């Protein structure tokens, strides 16, 4: 966010609406090299418990909001909403969020134990914020990165189902309409679900090809494999970039210029 503030402090466009050149300059300013991207990821580990993570996400479109952005009816309002600081009271979190906070690590440990039983040579770490190498407006914070001697490198995304906490996790995925059964009785994620958008975004940002969704309830865990869908992502990325250029940039510009004028 510091780069964004600096850009607008030195940006003296007199046009009511900035043209493509202004926005291109903004994008060039935001670009990170590989060392920057690695430093951001390392420096934001701990996610919501790390203030650096909150700061680094400001001004980005992050994977958990991709479906919301792509299907918003009023995109000006959507841009404002994305830039509005969270009003969540950490001492009075909604029950579903608190359930996720309470059990995410348990689900992670259950998955690691299960995976290592079959694939002993593997490592797991929880990344911070990943920034896209190819599109500086996009970021993601997956729940894990696994490096396995058999499976290669892949992401993990953990979902703890509060409303279905007493269901078997496979049934929780079906009842919540995250997944559907296919002919061989396995589950596939439904492409219209927000988790599908989120995971495809995480894969695109990370550059990896596979993610394992880990569903947790108090009956255990169930996993669903997902692979990168290039056609889906190419269209989504095009629309996300258009949203950023048309709506997010203007909203950022208004916020930063208001701050500058207030400080004068």
Feature roles, as predicted:
Residues 115-140, 148-250, 256:
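Nucleic-acid nuclease catalytic cores
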Residues 1-110, 114, 167-189, 254-264:
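Charged, glycine-rich intrinsically disordered N-terminal tails and low-complexity linkers that flank
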């Amino acid at each position: 966010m510091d780069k964004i503030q600096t850009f607008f402090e030195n940006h003296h466009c007199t046009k009511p609406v900035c043209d493509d050149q202004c926005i291109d300059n903004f994008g060039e300013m935001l670009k990170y090299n590989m060392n920057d991207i690695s430093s951001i990821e390392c420096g934001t580990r701990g996610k919501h418990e790390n203030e650096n993570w909150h700061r680094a996400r400001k001004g980005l479109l992050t994977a958990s909001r991709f479906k919301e952005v792509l299907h918003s009816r009023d995109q000006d309002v959507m841009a404002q909403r994305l830039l509005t600081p969270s009003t969540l009271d950490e001492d009075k979190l909604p029950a579903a969020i608190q359930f996720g906070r309470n059990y995410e690590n348990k689900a992670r440990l259950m998955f690691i134990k299960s995976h290592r039983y079959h694939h002993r040579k593997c490592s797991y770490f929880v990344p911070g914020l990943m920034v896209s190498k190819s599109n500086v407006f996009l970021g993601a914070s997956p729940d894990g990165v696994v490096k396995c001697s058999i499976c290669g490198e892949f992401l993990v995304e953990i979902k703890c189902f509060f409303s279905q906490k007493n269901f078997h996790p496979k049934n929780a995925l079906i009842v919540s309409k995250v997944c559907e059964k296919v002919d061989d009785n396995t589950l596939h994620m439904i492409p219209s679900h927000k988790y599908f958008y989120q995971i495809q975004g995480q894969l695109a940002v990370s550059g990896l090809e596979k993610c394992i969704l880990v569903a947790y309830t108090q009956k255990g865990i169930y996993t669903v494999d997902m692979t990168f869908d290039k056609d889906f992502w190419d269209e989504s990325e095009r629309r996300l970039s258009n949203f950023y250029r048309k709506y997010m940039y203007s909203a950022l510009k208004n916020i930063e210029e208001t701050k500058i004028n207030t400080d004068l």
